[in-house]
Structures are given as structure tokens and as C-alpha cells.
């Protein structure tokens, strides 16, 4: 059973889907390396993992076949001056219409570029304002912290000065009392 399944898998790898379907209808084996059409023959030269190569053989034309037909171009009718003038006016109208369309597209493109530039400028201005506001706020906070630190230092110095004055007074009192 396993051998049959392996053989079936190998056959499936070798056959194309079209060959597989055809083998259901035509059980006799066919040469899958040669395909013939009305006026050409295709031979498979080699089959590799990287791709396939084919040889295309064109059959010579048979003497029975009809002579090649040449398509006759429609006869040009003589154009009157009015028809020529109408065609020229229509062409001029098309040219002007195309020019107007190109100008409209350019105007739309410039408008879009202007809008994008305006938006970028607004965003830049907003960013600058926000950065400036943050900087001012930070500077104010630093100033307040500095003033608070200075006030604390001054308070400590005054406290030390008061303590030193009290120590001196106590020493003087001690000297007076003992002396």
C-alpha cells in the first residue's frame, strides 16, 4: 500500500494538471514531450528544477492553403474645405481642452503643495510656541526653586548667627558671674 502511494505521489509530481485530467479520459500513455498544433509543434527539451526549455518548430505553409489576403485600406474620400475646417476646429478644441485640463491639474497640484506647506508652517509654529511655553514654565520653576533655596540658606545663616549671638551672650554672662 505504501509503495502504491509513493508511486502515485511520484507520478503526480511528474504530470501536469492537464496531463492528469487527460489521463483520466485517455488511459493509453501519450508522449507528453511533444505537443502539436495546426501550424507548429512544441517539443520539451529538458525539465529542471529551475525551469523548462522548449523547442518550437513551425510547419511550412501548405500549397493548398489560401493565398494570404491583404486587407485593403478603406478608400479615402475627398474632403471638402468645410470638413477640413471642422476637423481643424475640433482638433483645436481638443488641444485647448487638454491644455485646460493640464493647467487645472497643475493648479490643483500647486494648491495641494501650498496647503501642505501651510500645514507644516502651522505645525512648526505650534511646536515653537509649545516649546517656548514649556521653556518659560521651566525657567519660572527654576527661578522659584532658586529663590526658595536662597531663602532657606539665608534662614539657616540667620539661625546660626542668632545661635552664635546667644552663645556669646551666655559666655559673657558666665564671665560676669564668675568674675
From Swiss-Prot:
Keywords assigned: Cell projection, Coiled coil, Cytoplasm, Endosome, Golgi apparatus, Lipoprotein, Membrane, Palmitate, Phosphoprotein, Ubl conjugation
Region (Membrane attachment): 1-26
GO cellular component, as recorded: cytoplasm; endosome; Golgi apparatus; growth cone; lamellipodium; membrane; neuron projection; neuronal cell body
Topology relative to the membrane: Peripheral membrane protein
InterPro entries: Stathmin_CS, Stathmin_fam, Stathmin_sf
Region annotation (Regulatory/phosphorylation domain) ranges: 39-96
Residue stretches in coiled coil: 75-179
Pfam family of the protein (one): Stathmin
Residues the record lists as Phosphoserine modifications: 16, 50, 62, 73, 80, 97
Gene3D superfamilies reported for this sequence: 6.10.280.30
Lipidation (S-palmitoyl cysteine): 22, 24
All residue ranges annotated as the SLD domain in the record: 38-179
Tissue expression from the record: Expressed in neurons (at protein level). Present in growth cones and abundant in developing neurons.
One GO term of the biological process aspect: positive regulation of microtubule depolymerization
Outcome of substituting residue 62 to A: Partial loss of phosphorylation. Complete loss of phosphorylation by MAPK8, increased microtubule solubility, and reduced neurite length
Induction section of the entry: By nerve growth factor.
Assembly and oligomerization: Interacts with ITM2C. Interacts with MAPK8. Interacts with KIFBP. Interacts (via the N-terminal region) with CIB1 (via C-terminal region); the interaction is direct, occurs in a calcium-dependent manner and attenuates the neurite outgrowth inhibition of STMN2.
Similarity section: Belongs to the stathmin family.
Name of the featured protein: Stathmin-2
Organism placement in taxonomy: Eukaryota, Metazoa, Chordata, Craniata, Vertebrata
Gene: Stmn2
Amino acid at each position: 500500500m505504501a509503495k502504491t502511494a509513493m508511486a502515485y505521489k511520484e507520478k503526480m509530481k511528474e504530470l501536469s494538471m492537464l496531463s492528469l485530467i487527460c489521463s483520466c479520459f485517455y488511459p493509453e500513455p501519450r508522449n507528453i514531450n511533444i505537443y502539436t498544433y495546426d501550424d507548429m509543434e512544441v517539443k520539451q527539451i529538458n525539465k529542471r528544477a529551475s525551469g523548462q526549455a522548449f523547442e518550437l518548430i513551425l510547419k511550412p505553409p501548405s500549397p493548398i492553403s489560401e493565398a494570404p489576403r491583404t486587407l485593403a485600406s478603406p478608400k479615402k474620400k475627398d474632403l471638402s474645405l468645410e470638413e477640413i475646417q471642422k476637423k481643424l476646429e475640433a482638433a483645436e478644441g481638443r488641444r485647448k481642452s487638454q491644455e485646460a485640463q493640464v493647467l487645472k491639474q497643475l493648479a490643483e497640484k500647486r494648491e495641494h503643495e501650498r496647503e501642505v506647506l501651510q500645514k507644516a508652517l502651522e505645525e512648526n509654529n505650534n511646536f515653537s510656541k509649545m516649546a517656548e511655553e514649556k521653556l518659560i514654565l521651566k525657567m519660572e520653576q527654576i527661578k522659584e526653586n532658586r529663590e526658595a533655596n536662597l531663602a532657606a540658606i539665608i534662614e539657616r545663616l540667620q539661625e546660626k548667627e542668632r545661635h552664635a549671638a546667644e552663645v556669646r551672650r551666655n559666655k559673657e554672662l558666665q564671665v560676669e558671674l564668675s568674675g
